[in-house]
Structures are given as C-alpha cells and as structure tokens.
From Swiss-Prot:
Residue span of region G3: 81-84
Family: Belongs to the TRAFAC class translation factor GTPase superfamily. Classic translation factor GTPase family. EF-Tu/EF-1A subfamily.
Effect of V157A: In strain: F/IC-Cal-13
GO biological-process terms attached to the record: translational elongation
Gene source species: Chlamydia trachomatis serovar D (strain ATCC VR-885 / DSM 19411 / UW-3/Cx)
Protein name: Elongation factor Tu
Catalyzed reactions per annotation: GTP + H2O = GDP + phosphate + H(+)
Function field: GTP hydrolase that promotes the GTP-dependent binding of aminoacyl-tRNA to the A-site of ribosomes during protein biosynthesis.
Location in or out of the cell: Cytoplasm
SUPFAM superfamilies: EF-Tu/eEF-1alpha/eIF2-gamma C-terminal domain, P-loop containing nucleoside triphosphate hydrolases, Translation proteins
Assembly notes: Monomer.
EC class name: hydrolase
EC number: 3.6.5.3
Length: 394
C-alpha cells in the first residue's frame, strides 16, 4: 500500500497555537514538527522558517501567518502560527484560518497574562470549539517552586471554564528542550499531540450539513424559468428538493427543477461546487444577489446581532478617525452589502482604528445570518474592518 493514498484517507483538522507573546507558541510549533518527524509524519521546520511568516490577505486585511503541515498516526493537521498579537486577532476574526481547535501555550514561569485572556475570549467569540493547554518552560521551574505550577494550572482552569471551555487537558513540557532533542521532552510533545488527537473531535464535513448556497447571480432562460447561480457553501441539493429563498425580502419556498454545472445537467450539487439552480414558479424579479437558497427552515433572516470586530489601522487602509454609536457602514455578508447602524457597549465612547471590540449592529434589511458567521465592514467600497457574529439578537 503506497503512503500517498494512506495520507489522503486521514481526517483533516485545522488547529493553531494561541497565547501570550513570548510564551513559546512558535517554538512549540517547531517542536511538534521535530517530534513527529522522528516518526516520518512531518518535515521538521525550524523556528526561523516558521517565524519568517508570509503575508496573506483575508477579507481585504493583511495578516502574517505561517501554515505548517504535519500528521499524527490518525490525522492530518494544518497548523497556523502568527507572529504578532494583532495578527492573531485579525486571523481569528476574519477566519483566514478557521480553527477546529487550538493549543493554548502558557509559560509556567509567568502564568496567564493579558493576551492569554484575550485569546481565550477571542477563541470563544469566534467559535473555536476546543482548547488543549501546553504549560511551557517547565524546565525553568525549580523544585521548591513546583507548587506554583499547580496554582498556575488552577488559574488557567478557572479562566477557561469562565469562557465555557470545560475539562481542557493540560500537558506540561518544554518546547525549547524538545526542539533541542531532549528525549523526555520530545515525549511530552507527543503526549500533547495525543491529547489533541483525543480531545479535538473531527468536525462535521460541510457536505453533511444542511444545504445552503449564497446567490451570486440571477437570470431567466426563456421557456424554462429562473436560474440562480452561486457556490454551494454546504450540504447537497438534488433535483425536486424543496428549498427556501431567505434574506432581503420575505422568505419564499420553491422547488429545484434542475441543477447545472458548466451547462451540463446534474442530478445533484455538492458543497464547494459552482452551480446554477432552476427554480419553479420564481420570477426573475422575485430573487436577487445576496439572498441564500437553503434547506427549508435551516436558516432564518435576521437584522440585529452582537459581533466581535477588528477595525483596521490607517496603515492597513482603514479609517483615519474613530467612529461612534450611530456609525452606518456597509456590512458585507457572503455575497451582499447591507447598511447597518452600530451601537457601542456602555462605557465605550468611541472605537479607534486598530481596536478589537464588541458591539451591536442593526441592519436596514434582513439577511440570512448565523452565529459564528464572518463578515467585512466596508465604507465607500474599501474594507475598514472584519467581524464575526457572536450572538443573534433579532
């Protein structure tokens, strides 16, 4: 049996290292590749190759992030590591690398620090479902200070539980020692990856979720009816399925009478495919770009929500001035821009470029929204921020 086919059959998981600056996130990422390269499951990547991160763009925002690939016996992992705190905030909020779980790296010598707390909160707001903790720099702790590590652990458990992360496994080790080849500490990194394998479940594949397709374009075919086109976000749609058109106007129900791809008729369309759907009894003026076609009652139109937002700095092409309650930019969801009115939380007078903030939005027309969904904030055609819906209000 060739190795290639074996690799493709492993479930794929996206994870990332999060935590306070200088607690050892990048060193740990390198140490994981070192530990697994011994089993032929990873190519060893040294610190500088990960730290020298390429720039990428997500929703118009530049993010520095390194993507490292490796495998355990059971899974294939794509691991994201960011150099700066602002890059983490942007990466998590824009969903540039959507995480199925995260490894929270905490230095045993410092314990939980401000960014540790901020990353845990951010992970909760953007819907990172599971966290495994690596208590790093254990080699720096003297025997008489050993009890301090227990206190650090207790504080971490409390912090995590407060944000809804219960029963997170905590592995103690030293990323640097593992990277230097110390066998006992390499074993600790393996233990960490075993905990990741065991505690971060394989996510449901997009294909198994309820059907949804954002509409990009609408046109009529004489004698046949109205066709809507787009890329299927999730699920499967078959000819003669009942579907709903949701967003921007009143929800309508219809039946799919044809599925086409590259002008060929298909029995079904699947997640990830670009298709045209022929809809029964729907006029060209009944439907528009920005609505979604979906499994009936799987998504509802909403106008009001709470969100976690990163506001671009001036240098990133963002605003030059702060904004206040009553600010009315465009919110870009999937394929549509809708104007919304911002209400800042009590005690926050204004939002400055570069801030990471939570606020409420009231849209002027209803859109098919879900918690955890990403969006861009635009003003005059340029992106000035990005966000994730943390809670739907109405």
């Amino acid at each position: 049996m060739s190795k290639e086919t074996f690799q493709r059959n492993k479930p794929h998981i996206n994870i990332g290292t999060i935590g306070h600056v200088d607690h050892g996130k990048t060193t740990l990422t390198a140490a994981i590749t070192r530990a697994l390269s011994g089993d032929g499951l990873a190519d060893f990547r040294d610190y500088s190759s990960i730290d020298n991160t390429p720039e990428e763009k997500a929703r118009g925002i530049t993010i520095n992030a390194s993507h490292v690939e490796y495998e355990t016996a059971n899974r294939h992992y794509a691991h994201v590591d960011c150099p700066g705190h602002a890059d983490y905030v942007k990466n998590m909020i824009t969903g540039a690398a959507q995480m199925d779980g995260a490894i929270l790296v905490v230095s045993a010598t410092d314990g939980a620090m401000p960014q540790t707390k901020e990353h845990i909160l951010l992970a909760r707001q953007v819907g990172v479902p599971y966290i495994v903790v690596f208590l790093n720099k254990i080699d720096m702790i003297s025997e008489e200070d050993a009890e301090l590590v227990d206190l650090v652990e207790m504080e971490l458990v409390e912090l995590l539980e407060e944000k809804g992360y219960k029963g997170c496994p905590i592995i103690r080790g030293s990323a640097l020692k593992a990277l230097e080849g110390d066998a006992a500490y390499i074993e600790k990194v393996r233990e960490l990856m075993q905990a990741v394998d065991d505690n971060i479940p394989t996510p449901e594949r997009e294909i198994d979720k309820p059907f949804l397709m954002p509409i990009e374009d609408v046109f009529s075919i004489s004698g046949r009816g109205t066709v809507v086109t787009g890329r299927i976000e999730r699920g499967i749609v078959k000819v003669s399925d009942k579907v709903q058109l949701v967003g921007l106007r009143d929800t309508k129900e219809t039946i799919v009478t044809g599925v086409e791809m590259f002008r060929k008729e298909l029995p079904e369309g699947r997640a990830g495919e670009n298709v045209g759907l022929l809809l029964r009894g729907i006029g060209k003026n009944d439907v528009e770009r920005g609505m979604v076609v979906c499994l009936p009652n799987s998504v509802k139109p909403h106008t009001q929500f709470k969100c976690a937002v990163y506001v671009l700095q001036k240098e990133e092409g963002g605003r030059h001035k702060p904004f206040f309650t009553g600010y009315r930019p465009q919110f870009f969801f999937r394929t549509t821009d809708v104007t919304g009115v911002v209400t800042l939380p009590e005690g926050i007078e204004m939002v400055m470029p570069g801030d990471n903030v939570e606020f409420e939005v009231q849209l002027i027309s209803p859109v098919a929204l879900e918690e955890g969904m990403r969006f861009a904030i635009r003003e005059g055609g340029r992106t000035i921020g990005a966000g994730t819906i943390s809670k739907i209000i109405a």
